[in-house]
């Protein structure tokens, strides 16, 4: 797998996000755009990345790096 780092374009892997601790801790009805469109990693801290989805005004989100994959 290619390295995911600051500036990488990514998408969220649905199977890895659903039923995760993050999904259980908040509303688990995630918007489709996080799975279908590209987001840019703005920052990383430990095992987490801060992701910005830029086509429409949406809130940025912290997710685990293992829940992301390079956007192709």
Curated annotation (Swiss-Prot):
Keywords: Membrane, NAD, NADP, Plastoquinone, Quinone, Thylakoid, Translocase, Transport
UniProt entry tagged with the keyword Membrane: yes
Membership in a protein family: Belongs to the complex I NdhO subunit family.
Function of the molecule: NDH-1 shuttles electrons from an unknown electron donor, via FMN and iron-sulfur (Fe-S) centers, to quinones in the respiratory and/or the photosynthetic chain. The immediate electron acceptor for the enzyme in this species is believed to be plastoquinone. Couples the redox reaction to proton translocation, and thus conserves the redox energy in a proton gradient. Cyanobacterial NDH-1 also plays a role in inorganic carbon-concentration.
Domain of life: Bacteria
The protein's name in its UniProt record: NAD(P)H-quinone oxidoreductase subunit O
Enzyme's top EC category: translocase
Species, as recorded: Trichodesmium erythraeum (strain IMS101)
Subcellular location: Cellular thylakoid membrane
Lineage: Bacteria, Bacillati, Cyanobacteriota, Cyanophyceae, Oscillatoriophycideae
């Amino acid at each position: 797998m290619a390295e995911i780092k600051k500036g990488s374009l990514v998408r969220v892997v649905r199977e890895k996000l659903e039923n995760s601790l993050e999904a259980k801790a908040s509303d688990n009805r995630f918007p489709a755009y996080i799975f279908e469109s590209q987001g840019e990693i703005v920052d990383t801290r430990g095992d987490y990345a801060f992701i910005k989805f830029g086509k429409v005004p949406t809130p940025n989100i912290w997710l685990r790096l293992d829940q992301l994959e390079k956007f192709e």
